[in-house]
């Protein structure tokens, strides 16, 4: 039993959560864990995960699946998960070296059990809709507000009353449109579907668990159906997993795990498709132009030639001020992405009781491969502006066929080696445990340099009479990011636990309090996630410019040093303290945990502001240094109730609370005229902004207020 700060959530709790990415299934279920989902786009709705808040520049948690680091953990089907463990304090994360300084998430998938084959089928249909959609004003309201804004700025009204009335009565919708862009291009809701089938069982020396799943998610856009291709945001994925255990002998266990998935994504073409479309949805007013012109008006172009729409090719409206959101969505082309992923691992566990009772050896090798194929199929389109004489003025060119853009390929391969020597022995009142390990993680990708981490470490625990426990943990890891002198870092920690409920004097409280454990830990861990690789080297950039000299006056290009080398660059250091308690009451039907903690970081990698201009550098080219200091404090707690009603009905209630606050201690900042302009004393990343102090109601208030230096103000402006 571990004495550090950790939380465990059963896979049964996650099994029916209707999400396509696992990160969203963890949201709100574990104290100290925060998720932030920045997009709802199908296939790209992964949430960022923070354990115990934001504590420095690099805050990502390390995620392992069955003991192996996996970059694509979110694609695991919830029906495949046995349990998820969150490691929080220094004593829990030290074994994982510089990669685990911000917390570790351990995902354990299911294994087979002896018995006849058991088949499970899970089918889900989920209706999804936007939590909140901005409601735009109609054309008449927009025109009136526009006029009011002009008057407030001392200008003449832009729209006449006649024009406003035509916007309102829709008598001429193509000259005086009233387009609800959001309502027309966004669906009220859409569907996601999930299917999963599992088979598990075993006989003799073999046990197996096999899972096959499918997830499909439709987009929220209303797109044209006349095209033979889709420009909507769509997503589908097929998952497979096979976990097989073989008892080679009574003391030798061989485990083989295979998993993989195939995923297809589709979206409107643009580097930031959804963001670009939403920007234009929100900024294009209802008065700008119709989505497209209809054939009922017998339109002609400048030469008098009739203009007719064709199947899949409408007469797109537009002007030189706004880009037609409908045309961006339906005429700009699309992006198709296909992703493929496969992983396998083989492990062998050998009991060594014949050498020393309680001794065992474990070894594992694993590899995963990832491939991405991306195709952008782009199309240009023309648009028309309706002139006062009824002629449609044409702008731009239109391609009949979508052009094939260059396909982009990306592939990656990870290889991991693990070896562990473990010992566990109980003798009377004494329980002694220990583990020594070696871990190597190597990453290879086609477009970046390969890199490797190597870690050795150990864990030693002693428990006396199930009442007192001490754990000592260390990790010693080397990071490819730094030079040889600064590459390796030691992470030592110690933790203590007192099982108060096992004391004799506690027996009188046992009817009410089933379990009480008081624990504490302190340790130093290291973090290299906030530092870019190879900062100990200079970086040079070819400027394609240079000096002309020689008999032929040829140009010789020059180089610019865009990064000055910092051979002292290294990892940041984190000293963490944790105090906590675990409480079980009423035969452990009610369980509670509480932790209070502090994390102080030194050597935070940052760009110094106090340097001489004589160096010839700006902050863009200035090398970073390990000079920053930060501190984060917090507390967290959880409360759970689980009980049965009869033999067949189980219910549970749970809740948790988390709080953390970060502040900058030192960032080597340049002198500022006012104290509030320093980062020191404020949370990391705090923005310096003006604070609104109401609205000016009259010119008298403006005259009495401090002088505005940014612009002139009138009644109605923010003061």
Annotated model-derived regions:
Residues 130-132, 173-213, 217-220, 231-322, ...:
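Flexible loop and strand-edge segments within Gram-negative outer membrane beta-barrel domains
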Residues 50-56, 296, 699, 708:
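Short linear motifs in intrinsically disordered
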Residues 383-384:
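Active-site-proximal polar cores
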């Amino acid at each position: 039993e571990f004495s550090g700060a950790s939380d465990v959530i059963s896979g049964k709790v996650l099994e029916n959560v209707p999400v396509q990415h696992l990160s969203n299934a963890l949201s709100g279920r574990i104290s100290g864990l925060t998720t932030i989902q920045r997009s709802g786009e199908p296939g790209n709705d992964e949430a960022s995960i923070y354990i115990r808040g934001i504590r420095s520049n690099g805050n990502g948690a390390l995620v392992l699946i069955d003991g192996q680091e996996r970059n694509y953990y979110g694609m695991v089907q919830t029906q495949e998960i046995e349990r998820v463990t969150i490691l929080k304090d220094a004593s829990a994360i030290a074994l994982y070296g510089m990669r685990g300084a911000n917390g570790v998430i351990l995902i354990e998938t299911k294994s087979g059990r002896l018995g006849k084959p058991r088949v499970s089928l899970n089918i889900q249909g989920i209706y999804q809709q936007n939590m909140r959609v901005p409601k735009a004003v109609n054309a008449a309201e927009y025109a009136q507000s526009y006029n009011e804004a002009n008057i407030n700025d001392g200008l003449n009204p832009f729209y006449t009353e006649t024009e406003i009335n035509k916007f309102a009565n829709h008598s001429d919708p193509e000259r005086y449109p009233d387009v609800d862009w959001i309502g027309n291009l966004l669906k009220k809701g859409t569907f996601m579907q999930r299917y999963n089938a599992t088979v598990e069982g075993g006989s003799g020396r073999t046990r197996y668990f096999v899972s096959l799943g499918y997830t499909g998610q439709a987009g929220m856009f209303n797109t044209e159906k006349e095209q033979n291709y889709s420009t909507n945001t769509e997503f589908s994925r097929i998952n497979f997993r096979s976990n097989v255990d073989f008892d080679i002998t009574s003391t030798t266990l061989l485990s083989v795990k295979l998993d993989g998935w195939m995923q297809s994504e589709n979206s409107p073409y643009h580097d930031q498709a959804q963001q670009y479309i939403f920007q234009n949805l929100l900024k294009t007013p209802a008065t700008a132009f119709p989505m497209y012109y209809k054939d009922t008006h017998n339109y002609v172009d400048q030469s008098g030639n009739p203009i007719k729409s064709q199947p899949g090719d409408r007469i797109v409206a537009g002007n030189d001020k706004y880009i037609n959101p409908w045309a961006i969505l339906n005429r700009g082309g699309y992006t198709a992405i296909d992703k493929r992923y496969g992983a396998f691992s083989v492990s062998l566990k050998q009991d060594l009781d014949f050498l020393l009772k309680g001794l065992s050896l474990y070894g594992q090798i694993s590899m995963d491969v990832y491939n991405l194929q991306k195709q952008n199929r782009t199309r240009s389109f023309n648009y028309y502006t309706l002139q006062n004489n009824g002629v449609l003025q044409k702008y731009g060119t239109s391609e009949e066929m979508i052009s094939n853009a260059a396909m982009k390929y990306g592939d990656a391969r990870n290889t991991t080696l693990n070896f562990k020597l473990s010992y566990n022995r109980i003798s009377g009142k004494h329980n002694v445990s220990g583990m020594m390990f070696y871990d190597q993680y190597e990453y290879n990708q086609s477009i970046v340099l390969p890199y490797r981490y190597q870690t050795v470490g150990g864990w030693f625990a002693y428990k006396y009479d199930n009442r007192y426990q001490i754990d000592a943990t260390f990790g010693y890891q080397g990071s490819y990011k730094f030079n040889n002198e600064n590459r390796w870092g030691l992470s030592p920690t110690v933790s203590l636990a007192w099982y108060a409920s096992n004391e004799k004097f506690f027996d009188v409280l046992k009817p009410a309090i089933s379990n009480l454990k008081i624990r504490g830990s302190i340790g130093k861990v290291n973090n290299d996630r906030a530092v870019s690789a190879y900062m100990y080297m200079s970086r040079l950039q070819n400027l394609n410019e240079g000096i002309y000299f020689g008999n032929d006056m040829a140009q010789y290009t020059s180089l610019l040093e865009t990064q000055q080398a910092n051979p002292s660059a290294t990892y940041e250091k984190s000293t963490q303290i944790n105090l906590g308690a675990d409480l079980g009451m009423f035969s452990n039907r009610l369980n509670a945990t509480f932790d209070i903690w502090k994390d102080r970081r030194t050597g935070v990698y940052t760009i110094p502001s106090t340097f001489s201009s004589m160096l010839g550098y700006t902050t863009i080219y200035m090398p970073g240094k390990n000079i920053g200091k930060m501190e984060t404090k917090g507390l967290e707690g959880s409360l759970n109730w689980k009980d049965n009603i009869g033999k067949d009905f189980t219910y549970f209630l749970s809740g948790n609370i988390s709080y953390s606050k970060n502040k900058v201690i030192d960032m080597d900042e340049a002198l500022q005229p006012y104290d509030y302009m320093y980062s020191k004393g404020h949370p990391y990343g705090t923005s310096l902004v003006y604070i609104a102090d109401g609205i000016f109601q009259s010119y008298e208030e403006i005259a009495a207020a401090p002088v505005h230096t940014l612009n002139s103000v009138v009644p109605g402006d923010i003061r």
